[in-house]
């Protein structure tokens, strides 16, 4: 059995295979997932697993140098944004933050190596995580 925190084999595999600047999208239950992009569906029920708990587990294995978020998060879910930034800080990361419209965000998800769907049901609980390097 794995000794690290992240136990989902599919998600752990995707993290291990992506290179520098490649991306993984973490999303709420409602974000449309484009065909052709690998879907890792963790959603079990409304609110489970949460966006933040899943992000915390991902950050235990993935070095992130940049994040992309929809700018609308500030008007509709500022608390989640602040909690997300605290998680990056807890993992000793200070990624560059790129803000785009929600429409552009959805377009950018097409370039993700994988999209991880959570059971989160709060607005704009979505982030594109761009991989950094550990050296």
Swiss-Prot record:
Subunit description: Homodecamer.
An annotated GO BP: fucose metabolic process
Keyword annotations from UniProtKB, A to Z: Carbohydrate metabolism, Cytoplasm, Isomerase
A GO term from the CC aspect: cytoplasm
Alphabetized GO MF terms: D-ribose pyranase activity; fucose binding; intramolecular lyase activity; racemase and epimerase activity, acting on carbohydrates and derivatives
Superkingdom in the source lineage: Bacteria
Residues that bind substrate: 28, 102, 124-126
Location within or outside the cell: Cytoplasm
InterPro entries membership: D-ribose_pyranase, RbsD-like_sf, RbsD_FucU
Gene3D superfamilies hit by this protein: RbsD-like domain
Pathway: Carbohydrate metabolism; D-ribose degradation; D-ribose 5-phosphate from beta-D-ribopyranose: step 1/2
Protein name as annotated: D-ribose pyranase
Transmembrane portions of the chain: none
PANTHER family: D-RIBOSE PYRANASE
Protein EC: 5.4.99.62
Role this protein plays: Catalyzes the interconversion of beta-pyran and beta-furan forms of D-ribose.
Gene: rbsD
Reaction catalysis annotation: beta-D-ribopyranose = beta-D-ribofuranose
Active site: 20 (proton donor)
Cross-referenced NCBIfam families: PRK11797.1 (NF008761)
Family affiliation: Belongs to the RbsD / FucU family. RbsD subfamily.
Organism: Rhodopirellula baltica (strain DSM 10527 / NCIMB 13988 / SH1)
